[in-house]
């Protein structure tokens, strides 16, 4: 707990132990307090038109549940605070309602139509004030209520509220709408006003004393409503207790006023700073205007100078271009003649060459077609031979498969017959019912078999005795027939082979020679085979003949090419060479000429390379100097400005450094003088500040101690003494002149030990500050001082001070002297500060010049060296141009010699061919031989394979195998006889097998079962053999079909390829060309050679045509260029003449106005026209803005924008210079040059800015002052809370015997106050920062001393503003004295319901009283506001507690509206009995009003 809190506890204990005193809240006012007179409800639920007269103290609404008590109070609250965002009558809101319901308990209390809730009050002035609201239900599901507030004034006392709001319509009354109510009082003395905002409505009520506090915002309304709600529902409201600071503690204005004073002084100082900034803006305008004007005009000035120089160069170049165009035109005309002649020659040769090329191309196509046909023929011959072989193989395989099919068919038929016979036997046996029948059946079958054998064999006498003999006989015949069939098969096979060979040989002969008679096939085959040997021999010679013909044709072609080349060479070289000796001699001559020209050209190239190197070196030097030249000119300009500023002429860099050193010494001396004057000025300011204090004290701690001890400074008591007496009293008290006068020294003595910060010597004098005398010392006044008898053994002599502490008049007189002296010292300080600033600026310029331009400023002029380099470069360019012409002539001679040598290199190897005259005949003879060989070769290639196959089988053609058909018939007949004999053998075998059955004629049937089994086994065996035979037959047939299909495919393929082969042979015969690989190569090389020659001819002709077109176009262009060059030259010459006239005018104007040196900025001469125009355009844009307010400069600038008159820009620059010269304040700046004026303005403004900035620091409020103000405010409010506690000390509710308010300073904020007071140096970085406001610095300090506290998302400015409010430093709580527990925090959980209601009501009474005192200054002095609180359900209070409330109301002159059940009847005040009744299906509330009936 801090010291302040301990002091507060001590004062609280003292007040509680003292005798009861009358509360400060009940003074004897001469002004009566306003009172609420009545509440009127119109068209509410149960109250159509009811007025409740309110008692001056307590009005009680008594009734049962649902009688309308809460509705009445709701009407009162609604009229008092018509804010739908706040109103919420909880006890009537439906249970479980959600936020979606907007009723808030009000909608259900109203009836349909217009409703009113009106309050009538009588204020301190005796005025009748009627305020209220019009309510109306809004149709819809949200249960909205529309509220409109209004007021009435000057209403006579005789008019009732009901008569005002209703009108009589027959026997009924009608509620007037708000518009009709307004119309009713239009033109009368009654003032009707409708309010569109709740704030205006409450402002009216506050001004007339209806409510205790001005409710400016929704937050204030919320506080007021929460106060009413807390009183309405009773108890200790947590909403109120948690924010008692906002309800009880008024807003502090001390710190705000201090900050306003500080801001006022700072505002004045900053206005001066703003004026300085305006002057700085003038300075900036000076600087901006002169800079932009210089850029604008000088860039255009240098651009015109460059353009003038460039125009002269362009004129010279155009004249040179004119002459060059003439020479080029003559050269192109000569080229046109030469190229036209060559094109004519090429056109003559092109047609013949094109015909040769077409012929060669056709021959190549024929050869290639022949080769392709030959390849196809060979491929098809191979394929046909291969297919024939496959066809023969397939034919043999097919015949074998056919025989297998026939054998399988016969075997299958026999198997079928055997199976059918066995099945018939089986069926017969099955029909027998017993063995006897079976045997009989077998016997019958045996007889049938015997008959069958007789018929089949033709033996009618066949029986069991001779059956075996006949079987043996027929078996022998079968063997003989089998041998005969085998023999016929062999003969048939041999005959078939001979037939096959004959057919094959005959087919081959037909393929070679075509269709011939079979009888003449042998002769034709013999002749073909005889010629085949010679043809093969002749075909082998075709390769050698072909090679030989290729060589001859190649030599013949080379001979023709040599003749062509020789003709071309003679034509181009203008010679008539025919022999090899002549050509070789000319070749050696041209080779020697080529070597001479190459040597001469190499020498020219070397010389040119050397000259180009020299030119590159000169260009590099020139470019380097050109880069250095702008910086050199800039350095020269800076040197000139520096010499003007320093008044010195610098010859070398050493002189600049020496002057810079001297300037440093001068600056040091001026700085020492300025600092001495500053110290004197600060000392005078300190004296003036001390004497300006009300008490003249220079120690602020004395004021704090005086406030803490409750005393007054001695100097304040003597503040009104005269000037003559002031020295006497100052000397009388001596060192005790800073003493503090207190009422009781003993009461202060206990606090002295607790002092932490106080002066070394603290004097305390006991006395009454209101009646203090000087009888403290025994003194005697002397001439120069006072002798004071401190004690019998100690005297003190004090001289009269020159500046007495006592007496405001004496201090003010001395203040005038000090201020005059300070003004003089300040003026001297300003002069010295100006000198220091000037030295510093000059030193800054020197440093900048040394760092930037010193290395170049004293070097020679680079432009002179550039002129020398330009002259050397021009001479080298002339020599290079001359060498280029000579080089071109040599290269032409070199190209001509190389072309001739190239043609001779092609001709010389072919000279020997030119003398061979028989080459063409030999080539023709060889070609004829080759044709014959190629025919034989083609025949061998086509039919060689057939003849090779024919040769081994040709002998088969001698005899035709015509008896093959007869042999085949014999074979078939023998095979049929063999089959008949085999059937007879089988029938006889069957009879033999059934021999036993013949004995069954009379046998018993004991053997039938065995016979059946035997037949079944034979049947199964026969069926298996039949299935096997059928499978073999199907396989054989499938194989036969497959082989037959393959054979058919091979035959069709062979026929197709044979036919294609015949067609290819006919086609190659039609072509008439026998192609081979060499023929194709020869034809292709011939075609390519002719194509290349033709392409070369055409390319050359195309090139020449293009060149002719180009030359013609070039001639036209050159002709136009020549005319244009001549015209441009004359135009440029006129332009140069005109520019010279304008330039002379510009020079004359600039030289006469002495601005040429500022415009002729040589560093700009090295920039391009676009860059200079960009500089000028940017400056023009800035100047348009800068001179927008100056009509003269604006017009001059507009005139200068004419690019045809550059002299107008110079005139504008002169006008700007003159304008700035006129604006220079000669009383401050001693120069006529605007640039110098800018420099002096910068120095002066910098000094003024520094002085005002330091003054602003002095004006800023200190953290210590803020801490003192906060402490005083907190102490004052603690005392006020103590006074409020006196009004609560005699309150008792049940076991509660006392209620009090406890106020404490928060520990974190107490630490902050201590840091503000004592940590000035420690936290200097925060409050001396220029970047932080005082509020932000305060917040940062709070965070620094309380690092454990989180600031959240709030800004330091917001936190700092909260920390300037003293209420945030305090914690305010309510405590009750209850039984043996003593003083404890008031909480609803620790108190009974009645005690909580009484305690809460007591607190609310104090809040209302506090609000009245807080708003006293804002309210008229003749107005005391009404006081009224509510209490619903007062049954929770006993009679004693209710009487206590009555006493509180009487003591505090306050009204109270209570709702109680029927069994509660207060003894005093007005009581209304409310009973809800229903009459004629209409519900209403019956009201009976009584006064004090409880006593009876």
UniProtKB/Swiss-Prot annotation:
GO terms for cellular component: cytoplasm; nucleoid. One of its GO terms (biological process) is chromosome condensation. Residues 1082-1091 have a biased composition (Basic and acidic residues). ATP binds at residues 63-70. The keyword Calcium does not apply. Residues 328-493, 536-632, 861-1171, 1235-1291 form a coiled coil. One of its GO terms (molecular function) is DNA binding. InterPro entries: MukB, MukB/SMC, MukB_hinge, MukB_hinge_sf, MukB_N_dom, P-loop_NTPase. Residues 694-811 are annotated as: Flexible hinge. Keywords: ATP-binding, Cell cycle, Cell division, Chromosome partition, Coiled coil, Cytoplasm, DNA condensation, DNA-binding, Nucleotide-binding. The keyword Protease does not apply. Residues 1082-1101 are annotated as: Disordered. It is found in: Cytoplasm, Nucleoid. PANTHER family: CHROMOSOME PARTITION PROTEIN MUKB, DUF4476 DOMAIN-CONTAINING PROTEIN. The hinge domain, which separates the large intramolecular coiled coil regions, allows the homodimerization, forming a V-shaped homodimer. Belongs to the SMC family. MukB subfamily. Plays a central role in chromosome condensation, segregation and cell cycle progression. Functions as a homodimer, which is essential for chromosome partition. Involved in negative DNA supercoiling in vivo, and by this means organize and compact chromosomes. May achieve or facilitate chromosome segregation by condensation DNA from both sides of a centrally located replisome during cell division. Homodimerization via its hinge domain. Binds to DNA via its C-terminal region. Interacts, and probably forms a ternary complex, with MukE and MukF via its C-terminal region. The complex formation is stimulated by calcium or magnesium. Interacts with tubulin-related protein FtsZ. This is Chromosome partition protein MukB. It comes from Actinobacillus pleuropneumoniae serotype 7 (strain AP76). The lineage of its organism: Bacteria, Pseudomonadati, Pseudomonadota, Gammaproteobacteria, Pasteurellales.
